[in-house]
Regions:
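Cap/insert and terminal regions of metallo-dependent hydrolase folds
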Residues: 105, 112-116, 122-216
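Binuclear metal-dependent hydrolase catalytic cores
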Residues: 1-116, 196-219
Length: 220
């Protein structure tokens, strides 16, 4: 029913317009609903403006019946977002990804289960509190970067690490919050030694650690 955006970095929003179009192509007959930080509407409106001529040609030529699927509803979070439907509750969490701000994680409550999703963040006390006794904490992790003077400076190394969470940060937060299972995602860089990463985090967290992959499914 809704798409939740954590922050306005390109790797989190670049496919948003294609999701809008693909959902319409595959039969969505209700508005495309997006929730995220202030600035989301401006971003999406500018993207839609760039594709307006192409979309108008599609609409005129393809004659699809589901016109409602092209309606858009954008909610920009003002302090806090809360959503409830069919026994599921979602709450936003403001996290620390400066200079990108605001940035959010999300809590999901399903029956008696609690899932917390970090979004991109350095160590965040808000996130720690929101993760207390969570059944699952899904958390990003900065693994490491090797210096390459063709694509980075020393400042690059320092600054990229500084607005993400190290393995120690992730493990310490999960332990402090008494998280039952920790699922790692959003790896920087994307290629790394999984067992070494789990071993490093397990120095600080004694629960189950799962290295997440796209399309993984977990039973609550």
């Amino acid at each position: 029913d809704i798409i939740l955006i954590t922050h306005l970095h390109s790797d989190h929003i670049v496919d948003l317009y294609q999701l809008y179009i693909s959902g319409w192509h595959t039969g969505r007959a209700k508005p495309f609903k997006i929730v995220g930080p202030i600035g989301l509407k401006k971003f999406f409106d500018k993207t839609a403006e760039a594709y307006a001529d192409e979309l108008n040609l599609r609409v005129d030529w393809e004659k699809r019946p589901n016109h409602k699927g092209l309606d858009i509803e954008i909610t920009e979070i003002d302090n806090e977002f809360i959503y409830e439907k069919m026994g599921i509750k979602i709450k936003s969490i403001e996290v620390q990804h400066q200079p990108v701000e605001p940035a959010y994680g999300y809590q999901f409550f399903v029956d008696d289960k609690k899932i917390t999703y970090s979004g991109d963040t350095r160590y965040s006390i808000n996130l720690e509190k929101a993760s207390e006794d969570a059944d699952y904490l899904i958390h990003e992790v900065f693994v490491s970067l090797n210096f390459d003077d063709k694509r980075m400076t020393q400042d690059t190394l320092v600054n990229v690490k500084e607005y993400h969470s190290t393995p120690k940060d992730v493990g310490t937060l999960a332990q402090a919050a008494n998280v039952k299972k920790l699922i790692l995602n959003h790896f920087v860089p994307p290629v790394f030694d999984e067992e070494s990463l789990k071993a490093e985090i397990s120095q600080y967290y004694d629960g189950e650690i799962i290295v997440g992959n796209d399309l993984d499914e977990f039973i609550l």
